[in-house]
């Protein structure tokens, strides 16, 4: 995946939504790619106990959304911005219930890394191999009724952790991009 966009980015209207940015941190461990996720603490305002990417609300001091994602990652798990190689900005997403407009950035981080987790925000770190998100047997799709409307929800189960909501949608989108890039490479060979 390169920083150059080979597909049109989908941006969402932000009216009435809180703008936030997240980092999708990818690292190599034991010869396989992994993604760093966090388990939110019970002390945060939104998404308590859920599995998410490091990230948060755009701050007035943030020059841009990428800086927001890197700042929040530093605050939550202690990864220095200089240690992240940002590869791409993905499509915008939103959270259904809490009304966040989320802009994800994919970045490579070194491994091993000495994380400094903020206990007020983060209860723990989860680092599933990226491969599980390519395996249809590891995912399920449910239809939830939200405000009287059906909403499709993809979720992944890994080592007892339920990865769902915007986090699962972002991971599913990342997998689709990687698969389409691999398919494009096969066609060009």
Describe the residue ranges of each PLM region:
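NUDIX/MutT-family hydrolases
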Residues: 117-159
